[in-house]
Design a protein with these regions (language model features):
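Hydrophobic membrane-insertion alpha-helices, especially the h-region
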Residues: 11-31
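A mature extracytoplasmic/lumenal domain signature
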Residues: 52, 62, 70, 99-101, ...
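Short extracytoplasmic
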Residues: 45-78
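Structured domain cores in non-transmembrane regions
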Residues: 72-145
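Short nucleic-acid-contacting surface segments enriched for D/E, G, S/T with interspersed K/R
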Residues: 59, 82-93, 173-185
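Extracytoplasmic/periplasmic terminal helices and flexible tails
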Residues: 106-109, 127-226
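N-terminal positive-inside, membrane-proximal cytosolic segments immediately preceding the first
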Residues: 1-13
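Alpha-helical transmembrane signal-anchor/signal-peptide segments
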Residues: 32-50
Length: 226
């Protein structure tokens, strides 16, 4: 029988933990690559208008916390199919998104289940992009046969946007109202199951829309030049 001392056992446990982390990281990278490729090939990239999450402390650590206009939904803008099933508090649902003339996407329907056929999920518009795309999220609070005057609250799992440390520190110096005045937009890759991966966060810089990273880079460069 092979006897292992405490040091060897510790090394084995450490190696096992590192292996699990490595496998997890590779799996996530593989999923991200496949989702990006699928979304680009099938025109499944959407843009959501967003704001700083907390007017007093909108940024924390190395990420920007965001809220989205589409988290507050007027039921009068939803299709009839949205109200066929009782909606329970905090459960996952699929939100049918449509693109507007401003290239921003809005919620036009809510489903308990994702349509089984991809052809039922989305057709194509003149640009070759999907007319409707479903994304996964939750509804708060109850949404049981809401009337047209009611507001539905939703939450989505992509509200934290991570940044490099130096950019995050600069963003932390921006007042929330000034940040929101930049009209931030979060772009997402969407897979066929409604799961989303962040493509990037953009803001207005003059009349041009640029990535938040590029915006911070130029602002930091300007401060250093003074």
């Amino acid at each position: 029988m092979i006897k292992l001392n405490a040091k060897k056992i510790g090394l084995i446990c450490l190696a096992s933990a590192l292996l699990v982390q490595l496998v997890t990281a590779v799996s996530l990278l593989s999923y991200s690559y496949r989702t990006k490729a699928y979304a680009e090939k099938n025109g499944r990239i959407i843009n959501l208008a967003c704001l700083a999450y907390d007017p007093y402390s909108p940024f924390k650590g190395r990420y920007i916390r965001l809220s989205f206009e589409e988290e507050t939904i007027s039921s009068k803008n939803l299709d009839k199919e949205s109200f066929q099933n009782p909606k329970k508090h905090g459960e996952h649902y699929y939100f049918r998104m449509e693109e507007g003339a401003d290239s921003l996407w809005t919620v036009r329907g809510i489903r308990k289940d994702l349509p089984k056929k991809e052809s039922e999920q989305a057709g194509e518009n003149a640009k070759g992009q999907a007319k409707s795309i479903y994304i996964k999220g939750k509804t708060y609070p109850y949404m049981l046969y809401a009337s047209a005057s009611e507001t539905i609250h939703a939450t989505f799992p992509f509200s934290e946007y991570y940044m490099q440390e130096n950019y995050a520190r600069y963003v932390d110096t921006i007042k929330w109202e000034d940040f929101n005045a930049l009209k931030p937009v979060l772009s997402l890759y969407v897979d066929k199951n409604g799961q989303c991966i962040q493509k990037g966060l953009t803001v207005l810089s003059g009349s041009q829309r640029v990535s938040i990273e590029e915006y911070c880079k130029e602002k930091i460069k300007g401060v250093k030049a003074q």
